[in-house]
Regions:
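Positively charged, helix-rich recognition surfaces that bind polyanionic ligands
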Residues: 1-191
């Protein structure tokens, strides 16, 4: 299943909009660099909402694993994810403020409490390669940058098209490739 992150994006968008408004007032009043009480309250409110969302998302994933007798949870990770990312003013405000590392650490903790094995899997090229066409899943290397070609393409946001024309959700394709890369279970039954 896919957990919808639109609520989290909305929280961040409202926080950034409100903070920009408060900052403009502060700048006009020449109050210096220290955050005002309203800015602190705005940040505290946003952090509480994000923390609540992450706790609920992690709990929902763990409850699903427990109710369906899933003993291993595989999570993709990327070491340089969001570091010095510059994807435009609007996208930076919505995307960079999402704490994926916080969700991963909460999942790791809850897995340990409930006896579920937690596996971190490197996820380079998992969203570009096609799961159904069994594309190669290379590991990204900064020292030796190669250009790879994949059989499928992402036709628009959230939709991935395989070589044979079949379409599937891009997040599902990426998740299946992360699972395939981890070699935790055999996926031959899916092909």
């Amino acid at each position: 299943f896919i957990i919808d992150g639109r609520r989290l994006k909305a929280i961040n968008q409202w926080y950034n909009k409100r903070n920009a408004f408060l900052q403009s007032i502060k700048d006009r009043q020449h109050l210096g660099y220290k955050p005002t009480n309203r800015q602190k309250a705005n940040t505290r409110d946003r952090n509480n909402k994000v923390n609540d969302y992450m706790n609920k998302a992690a709990r929902k994933i763990i409850d699903y694993c427990i109710s369906n007798d899933i003993g291993t949870l595989v999570a993709g990770y990327n070491e340089i994810f969001q570091h010095s990312s510059d994807i435009g003013k609007v996208n930076n405000q919505n995307f960079v403020n999402i704490p994926y590392g916080q969700l991963q650490s909460k999942l790791e903790y809850l897995c340990e409490l409930n006896g579920i094995v937690f596996v971190k899997q490197e996820e380079s090229y998992t969203s570009k390669s096609s799961f159904w066409d069994r594309d190669e899943l290379p590991v990204y290397n900064d020292d030796n940058i190669k250009t790879y070609s994949f059989s499928g393409i992402r036709i628009h946001r959230g939709m991935y098209q395989c070589k044979n024309g079949k379409c599937l959700n891009a997040d599902v394709n990426g998740a299946l490739n992360i699972l395939r890369k981890s070699n935790v279970v055999s996926l031959e039954g899916l092909y």
